[in-house]
C-alpha cells in the first residue's frame, strides 16, 4: 500500500537570536507578496527600510523567550510532530515551516526521494488568511511543479469551527478557567483590513461587527475576522462562559495601515478601566506558543496591563502538544483533507 505522509505546516522562526539570522528570516517573511501585498519595487523598498532597525529589536525580543533547545515554536512543533506519529498509521509525519527551517522545499524533496507519492498537508492555522494558509499552499505547489515531483497532495482546510478543535481548546484551557479571574480575553493575530477587502467583495460586509451572526456563508469562507469571531463564540458557548466575562481582540499589527479591530493593546487598557484586575489571555489563532504569545502577550502585554492598574495577566498556553489537540488534528487530517 502506498504510504501517505502527513506534513505539518507552520509559519517559521529564525535559526537563532543573532541579528543576522533574524534579518534573514524577516526578509524572507516580509518579502512574501501574500504578507506585504505591494508591488515588488515598493515592497522591496519598504522591507529594506524595516530591516534597518527591526532585526535588532526582534532579536532582543526573541532572546527574551528563546529556550535552551531553540525556538519555542520549532521545539513545540517538533513535540507535536512526535506526538502525532502514533495517531497517523498511514506513513511518516513530517514538519515544515513556510519561512526558515525546516523548509517546505527540503522536506518535500526528501519525501519524494523516499518514494512517498501521497502527502496530506496540515496547515496549522485554524482561521483562513492569504498570509498564512494560501502562501503555504502556494509554496507547496511551486516546489512540486519546479521539481516535477508528481506528488498527490490533499490539504486540511481551515478548521475554526470544527467541533473536535473547539473541544480540544476547551479541554486545554479549562484548568485556567477554574482559577480566580475577572475576564478572559481571546487575542487573535491581526490582519490589515485590505487583505480581507480584496477577498470579500460585498461592500456591506461589516469589519467592525461584534459577532458573526449576520455574516453570509460566502463572506465567512473568506473573512479571517469573521472566522475568529465564530471560533470565539463557539468556544465561549462550549466552555460555558458568561456574557460580559470574555471578549475578543487582535494583536501584532505592523505599520500604519488600518488593521482589524479592536486592537489588543487598546483592549488591555480598556479592561483595566472597566475594573478588571485579574485577566486571562488565550491566543486561539496560534496552535503553538511563539514570540507573539510568549513575548508580545506574556511579557509586554502583562507589563502594560499591570502598569495600567491591573493586578495580574496570565497567558494561557496554546494547544502545543496537548493530547486533546493531537487527537483532534489526527482526526481532522484524515477526515477533512481535500485535493490541493
UniProtKB/Swiss-Prot annotation:
**MF GO annotations:** ferrochelatase activity; metal ion binding
* Residues binding Fe cation: 189, 292
CDD domains from the xrefs? Ferrochelatase_C, Ferrochelatase_N
Cysteine pairs bridged by disulfides in the record: none
- Catalysed reactions listed for this entry: heme b + 2 H(+) = protoporphyrin IX + Fe(2+)
Give its E.C. classification number. Answer: 4.98.1.1
Task: Tell me where it mainly resides.
Answer: cytoplasm
Positions in coiled-coil regions: none
Q: Name one GO biological process term.
A: heme biosynthetic process
- Pathway in which this enzyme or protein is active: Porphyrin-containing compound metabolism; protoheme biosynthesis; protoheme from protoporphyrin-IX: step 1/1
Q: Tell me the InterPro entries matching this sequence.
A: Ferrochelatase, Ferrochelatase_C, Ferrochelatase_N
A GO cellular component term found in this entry reads: cytoplasm
Describe the family membership recorded for this protein in Swiss-Prot or TrEMBL.
Belongs to the ferrochelatase family.
What does this gene product do? Catalyzes the ferrous insertion into protoporphyrin IX.
Q: Which NCBIfam families match?
A: hemH (TIGR00109)
Q: What is this protein called?
A: Ferrochelatase
Coding gene? hemH
Amino acid at each position: 500500500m502506498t504510504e501517505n505522509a502527513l506534513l505539518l505546516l507552520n509559519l517559521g522562526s529564525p535559526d537563532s537570536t543573532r541579528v543576522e539570522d533574524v534579518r534573514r528570516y524577516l526578509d524572507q517573511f516580509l518579502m512574501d507578496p501574500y504578507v506585504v501585498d505591494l508591488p515588488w519595487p515598493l515592497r522591496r523598498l519598504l522591507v529594506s527600510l524595516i530591516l534597518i532597525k527591526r532585526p535588532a529589536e526582534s532579536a532582543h525580543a526573541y532572546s527574551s523567550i528563546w529556550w535552551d533547545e531553540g525556538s519555542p515554536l520549532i521545539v513545540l512543533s517538533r513535540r507535536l510532530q512526535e506526538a502525532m506519529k502514533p495517531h497517523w498509521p498511514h506513513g511518516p509525519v513530517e514538519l515544515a515551516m513556510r519561512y526558515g527551517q525546516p523548509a517546505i522545499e527540503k522536506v518535500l524533496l526528501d519525501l519524494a526521494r523516499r518514494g512517498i507519492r501521497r502527502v496530506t498537508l496540515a496547515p496549522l492555522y485554524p482561521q483562513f488568511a492569504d498570509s498564512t494558509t494560501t502562501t503555504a499552499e502556494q509554496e507547496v505547489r511551486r516546489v512540486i511543479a519546479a521539481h516535477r515531483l508528481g506528488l498527490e497532495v490533499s490539504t486540511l482546510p481551515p478548521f475554526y469551527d470544527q467541533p473536535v478543535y473547539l473541544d480540544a481548546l476547551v479541554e486545554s484551557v479549562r484548568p485556567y478557567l477554574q482559577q480566580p479571574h475577572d475576564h478572559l480575553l481571546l487575542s487573535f493575530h491581526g490582519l490589515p483590513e485590505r487583505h480581507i477587502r480584496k477577498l470579500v467583495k460585498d461592500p456591506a460586509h461589516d469589519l467592525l461587527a461584534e459577532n458573526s451572526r449576520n455574516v453570509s456563508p460566502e463572506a465567512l469562507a473568506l473573512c479571517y475576522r469573521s472566522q475568529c469571531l465564530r471560533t470565539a463564540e463557539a468556544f465561549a458557548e462550549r466552555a460555558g462562559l458568561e456574557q460580559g466575562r470574555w471578549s475578543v481582540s487582535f494583536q501584532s499589527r505592523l505599520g500604519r495601515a488600518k488593521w482589524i479591530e479592536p486592537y489588543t493593546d487598546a483592549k488591555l487598557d480598556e479592561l483595566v478601566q472597566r475594573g478588571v484586575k485579574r485577566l486571562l489571555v488565550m491566543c486561539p489563532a496560534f496552535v503553538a506558543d511563539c514570540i507573539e504569545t510568549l513575548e508580545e502577550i506574556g511579557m509586554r502585554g502583562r507589563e502594560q496591563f499591570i502598569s495600567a492598574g491591573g493586578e495580574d495577566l496570565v497567558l494561557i498556553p496554546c494547544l502545543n502538544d496537548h493530547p486533546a489537540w493531537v487527537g483532534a488534528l489526527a482526526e481532522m487530517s484524515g477526515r477533512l483533507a481535500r485535493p490541493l
